[in-house]
Amino acid sequence: MRIEKLLPPTPPAKTWTVALEGGKMLRVTESTVLDQGLFAGLELDEAALDALRSAAASAALRARAVNMLSVRAMSAGQLNEKLMAKGATERQAAETVAWAVDIGLVNDAEYAKALVRHYQAKGYGLYKIKNELYRRRVPKADWEDALAEMDDAEDAIDAFLAKKLRDPEDRKECKKASDALARRGFSWSQIAAGIERRKYQTD
């Protein structure tokens, strides 16, 4: 197989285009061009062609990972899952994720802290936040430090009850507010304490 043309990147693209005889196009990184000594007119044997195809697949997956992460942050587990859903093999996905971690595009510890801050700011409690960490495939090894940064739940519960519980002596109203707080991830003991505080506030 012969390389007919070797075209440099056209900004903002960063990949080189390798035009093979027969019209097949492969896009590879500059390091691949240099490492494999590519040039127009080069004849590729099967081993060299396989290596070039593998490099092109790797470059495409890295570009896809960058695009995904530019839309929103995600954990290494999420990125791996999404790459495989797009057709990457288990090995290809793992290698791409490892590359993203190595260059700092993915950082599970920082992502965990960002999730905790985000959901606590929205008024959610510990159990809801843990569920989100699990759902987003954040490794449990990164949970402890992130959860340690949570503020006390009292303020969030008190703010919610101030809006939703007008009469803390009304059992029906209390149950409705309690159920809503439970869905937000607060424990029943935290909720009960919050209702008691609300009673004193309305006396």
Identify the residue ranges that each predicted region occupies.
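An alpha-helical, amphipathic repeat domain used for nucleic-acid recognition
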Residues: 1-203
